[in-house]
């Protein structure tokens, strides 16, 4: 694996010179191998090690290099044709392969090669980009987008129209992460490497980036780039120091544990916020 990483790191340093026409065989094979390992879930761009999320930057670099070494090609779809550098994940799947993998894909859901989809996942008409990791039991609802290299945990619900930001465009240092057992409400956006920690509930229409203030109304504390575990979050505003205007923020209205979440439905958690 170290040899593979060294090839990727070296090639990335001269990425501006690389084109589909001049990419050498060693680099091409290394990049293709990494994409295949990401596709199978054997490797992932970010993983939790000793309680901390660690981003493997060299894997992200391999994803970026794949756009340098591959030319656009015609890609067949069920109702249409496409012209892109990245093949579709399910292009060669037959019924036996789908049965073996154990997830559902509802047309016209689109998943790029290099994204991993775990068992018991349901993909409604949605989009999952290259390098993403979607873990077991997760629902990616209609028109939701899982951005490049984003990490989605187990038993997560991404509601209709949710956007989970990627790392490729614009280029971000770390992927956006949604940990296990989270609920992200319809049309919400979580981007720029924000981490939503385990068991959190994000209401409909909440937008969180690295500069978004995440205000805990019980403690008065303000977080940036991280939603603490078990938070129930709604959109809100905080007043300016001079009181003349207010600016958007996300508000943590309560904290819940797994026991409470097991007894109370998501809608009930969001209704009782007073």
Curated annotation (Swiss-Prot):
The keyword Acyltransferase applies. Inhibited by N-ethylmaleimide, p-chloromercuriphenyl sulfonate, cobalt and copper ions. One of its GO terms (molecular function) is nucleotidyltransferase activity. It catalyses: (S)-2,3,4,5-tetrahydrodipicolinate + succinyl-CoA + H2O = (S)-2-succinylamino-6-oxoheptanedioate + CoA. Optimum pH is 8.2. Keywords: Acyltransferase, Amino-acid biosynthesis, Cytoplasm, Diaminopimelate biosynthesis, Lysine biosynthesis, Repeat, Transferase. Disulfide bonds: none annotated. It comes from the Bacteria. Substrate binds at residues 104, 141. One of its GO terms (biological process) is lysine biosynthetic process via diaminopimelate. The keyword Repeat applies. Its EC number is 2.3.1.117. Pathway: Amino-acid biosynthesis; L-lysine biosynthesis via DAP pathway; LL-2,6-diaminopimelate from (S)-tetrahydrodipicolinate (succinylase route): step 1/3. InterPro entries: DapD_Trfase_Hexpep_rpt_fam, Hexapep, Hexapep_transf_CS, THP_succinylTrfase_dom1, THP_succinylTrfase_N_sf, Trimer_LpxA-like_sf. Its main location: cytoplasm. Coiled coil: none annotated. Pfam families: Hexapep_2 (PF14602), THDPS_N_2 (PF14805). Gene3D superfamilies: Hexapeptide repeat proteins, Tetrahydrodipicolinate-N-succinyltransferase, N-terminal domain. Was originally thought to be a homodimer, but is rather a homotrimer as shown in orthologs. Catalyzes the formation of N-succinyl-2-amino-6-oxo-L-pimelate from succinyl-CoA and tetrahydrodipicolinate, a key step in lysine biosynthesis via diaminopimelate pathway. PANTHER family: 2,3,4,5-TETRAHYDROPYRIDINE-2,6-DICARBOXYLATE N-SUCCINYLTRANSFERASE (PTHR19136:SF52), MOLYBDENUM COFACTOR GUANYLYLTRANSFERASE (PTHR19136). Belongs to the transferase hexapeptide repeat family. This is 2,3,4,5-tetrahydropyridine-2,6-dicarboxylate N-succinyltransferase. It comes from Escherichia coli (strain K12).
């Amino acid at each position: 694996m170290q040899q593979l990483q060294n090839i990727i790191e070296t090639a990335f340093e001269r990425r501006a010179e690389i084109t589909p026409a001049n990419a050498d065989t060693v680099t091409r094979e290394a990049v293709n191998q990494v994409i295949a390992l990401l596709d199978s879930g054997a490797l992932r761009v970010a993983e939790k090690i000793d309680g901390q999320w660690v981003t493997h930057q060299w894997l992200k670099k391999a994803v970026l290099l794949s756009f340098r070494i591959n030319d656009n090609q015609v890609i067949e779809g069920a109702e249409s044709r496409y012209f892109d550098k990245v093949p579709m994940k399910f292009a060669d799947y037959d019924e036996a392969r789908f049965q073996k993998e154990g997830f559902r894909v509802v047309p016209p859901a689109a998943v790029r090669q290099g994204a991993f989809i775990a068992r018991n996942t349901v993909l409604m008409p949605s989009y999952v980009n290259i390098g993403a990791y979607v873990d077991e039991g997760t629902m990616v609802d209609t028109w939701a987008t899982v951005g490049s290299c984003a990490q989605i945990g187990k038993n997560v619900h991404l509601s209709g129209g949710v956007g989970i930001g990627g790392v490729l465009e614009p280029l971000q240092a770390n992927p956006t992460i949604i940990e296990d057992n989270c609920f992200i409400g319809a049309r919400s956006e979580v981007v720029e490497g924000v981490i939503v920690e385990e068991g959190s509930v994000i209401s409909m229409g909440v937008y969180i980036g690295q500069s978004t203030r995440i205000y805990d109304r019980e403690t008065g504390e303000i977080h940036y780039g991280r939603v603490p575990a078990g938070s129930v979050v709604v959109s809100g505003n905080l007043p300016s120091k001079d009181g003349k205007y207010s600016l958007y923020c996300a508000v943590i209205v309560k904290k819940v544990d797994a026991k409470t979440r097991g007894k109370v439905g998501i809608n009930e958690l969001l209704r009782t916020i007073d």
